[in-house]
From Swiss-Prot:
TM segment ranges: 9-27
Name of this chain's protein: Cytochrome b6-f complex subunit 7
UniProt-listed InterPro entries: PetM_cyt_b6/f_cplx_su7
One Pfam short name: PetM
Function per UniProt: Component of the cytochrome b6-f complex, which mediates electron transfer between photosystem II (PSII) and photosystem I (PSI), cyclic electron flow around PSI, and state transitions.
Taxonomic source organism: Prochlorococcus marinus (strain AS9601)
One Gene Ontology biological process: photosynthesis
Intracellular or extracellular location(s): Cellular thylakoid membrane
Length: 32
């Protein structure tokens, strides 16, 4: 149980920054 929660948390810690950076880059390129 704890291992599943930890793995899910790790996935979110990886995906959220990638999503934020990707979204920022898309907005920047669209702005140009």
């Amino acid at each position: 149980m704890a291992k599943e929660i930890f793995s899910i948390a790790a996935v979110f810690w990886i995906l959220i920054p990638i999503g934020l950076v990707g979204g920022a880059l898309l907005l920047k390129f669209q702005g140009d």
